[in-house]
A protein has these predicted regions:
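C-terminal glycine/acidic-rich active-site capping loop/insertion
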Residues: 224-238, 246-247, 275-358, 395-411
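C-terminal capping/lid region of NAD(P)-dependent oxidoreductase domains
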Residues: 123, 150-154, 376-392, 402-411
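Beta-strand-loop-alpha-helix segment that lines the small-molecule cofactor/substrate pocket
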Residues: 74, 80-81, 85-133, 147
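Predominantly a Rossmann-like dinucleotide-binding segment in NAD(P)-dependent oxidoreductases
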Residues: 10, 121-124, 131-235
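N-terminal Rossmann-like dinucleotide-binding module
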Residues: 1-52
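Conserved SAM-binding strand-loop segment of SAM-dependent methyltransferases
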Residues: 56-62
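Glycine- and charged-residue-rich phosphate/anionic-cofactor binding loop of Rossmann-like
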Residues: 28-32, 349-366
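Glycine-rich phosphate/pyrophosphate-binding beta-alpha loops
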Residues: 255-265
Length: 411
């Protein structure tokens, strides 16, 4: 397969960003089809091909019609959250790889349907979780695999981002606003959980066992709505949701979701092992025997030690992941190059007809956190079991084929 022929289902703003990243890959892939139920969005999408001086794709109003197009090898699905899984299932049943955008699941039932579709067809799907290909996330993965962190004990991650403007966008039926209006849980889990899961070898020798979630009161979105004169709305989504996940190998992951209060953006990543720690919010790493440690005396002459962070960037020269060694001087696409790396990984899987580096079991496990956290919160924070979507295969998975795009090992 010389060129991957891609169909894009869902032609909103995210599709426009992804198209820009695809165009920047120059020749590796061609968009041969597009689909949206809105003719206006189709028309705008086609106008972008005039801008890029590219041949216009065939367009459809129904995704099932696009999936019958023999000139499409695989599909990218940047649609509304609740339609990702159904479209992915439909694509796999037609023999086409599917790359879905990020989001959480509405139920575990739909996740099992997705897993069964992949297993029965031999065609997989992938989540385009770009943060798995972030430079620091991959560097820490590389350092962990080389043993610098020792045995992993505890991790943190999350999504904290001031998106309070969603409080006054419900009238426009903005989908993300509606989820926050009606639901209460860990609604956007994968930006932090994806990289942390790969570092912890989830679904390959480890798995999520149980979770508990706790939610605060909800004020931020309501205040944002009132600032625009909207008085008759109350958002269910808590200002802060905290979720603790217990893993089979004994690690604990703490997740924090907060998108309605004033704050800078963070994915809150922390990786703590017996020999070191990475803390995203400090922009630092501490590795025993490498990072600064000073023995001092207090005013009474008693000895004590202080420890200092080493800047993340100080480790790039020795521990930059091979992917970033190859691409750091040639960043293309959105989110600092992460978008294009995730896309390249997907296109490589399509070309080689191999399992993507983020496979259907990963997608199911990560997305399940949303609906399971809702259940835990509704029951006052009671523990909820996380399904084993691998049906036991996590204990001794068949080794993956070595690939530069792997997120499990470093090749």
């Amino acid at each position: 397969m010389k060129q991957v022929k891609i169909g894009i289902i869902g032609l909103g703003g995210r599709a426009e960003t992804l198209l820009a990243s695809i165009v920047a890959l120059s020749g590796e892939v061609v968009v041969t089809a597009g689909c949206d139920y809105s003719q206006a969005k189709i028309d705008h999408f086609l106008s972008l091909f005039d801008k890029y001086k590219l041949k216009k794709p065939k367009t459809y109003l129904r995704h099932l019609d696009l999936l019958d197009d023999k000139n499409v090898d695989a599909v990218i699905v940047p649609t509304s959250w609740n339609s990702h899984i159904q479209i992915a299932c439909d694509a796999m049943k037609k023999g086409k790889y599917a790359a879905i955008e990020v989001g959480g699941a509405a139920s575990c039932d739909e996740l099992w349907q997705m897993v069964h579709a992949a297993e029965s067809t031999g065609v997989s799907c992938m989540m385009l979780e770009n943060c798995c290909y972030g430079r620091n996330e991959l560097m820490v993965l590389n350092m962990v695999r080389q043993g610098l962190f020792g045995e992993l004990i505890y991790c943190e991650c999350g999504y904290e981002h001031d998106l309070s403007e969603m409080g006054y966008r419900t009238d426009s039926r903005q989908e993300r606003s509606l989820h926050n209006l009606h639901r209460n849980g860990e609604l956007y889990p994968t930006h932090g959980l994806g990289p942390i899961s790969k570092i912890l070898k989830i679904n390959r020798g480890n798995r999520f066992l149980t979770l508990t979630s706790t939610a605060t009161k909800s004020r931020g979105f309501d205040l944002a709505a009132r600032s625009r004169g909207i008085e008759n709305v109350h958002f269910n989504e808590a200002d802060i949701v905290v979720t603790n996940i217990k893993c089979a190998n004994g690690e604990v992951i703490t997740m924090t979701h907060g998108v309605s209060l004033p704050r800078p953006y963070s994915r809150d990543c922390r990786v703590q092992g017996t020999k070191g720690i990475w803390l995203e919010n400090s922009k630092g790493v501490y590795i025993e025997g490498i990072s600064p440690r000073y023995d001092k005396l207090d005013v009474a002459g008693n000895p004590y030690s202080t420890h200092e962070w080493t800047p993340e960037s100080d480790f790039y020269e020795r521990f930059d992941h091979p992917i970033w060694q190859a691409y750091r001087n040639h960043e293309v696409g959105g989110h600092g190059g992460m978008d294009s790396l995730a896309l390249r990984a997907f296109f490589d899987a399509v070309k080689t007809r191999s399992t993507p580096p983020i496979d259907v079991y990963d997608v199911a496990a990560w997305m399940s956190i949303t609906c399971l956290s809702e259940q835990s919160i509704a029951m006052g924070g009671l523990p909820v079991p996380v399904p084993d979507f691998t049906n036991g295969k996590w204990v001794c998975r068949e080794p993956e084929k070595p690939s530069r795009w792997s997120l499990n090992e470093v090749y």
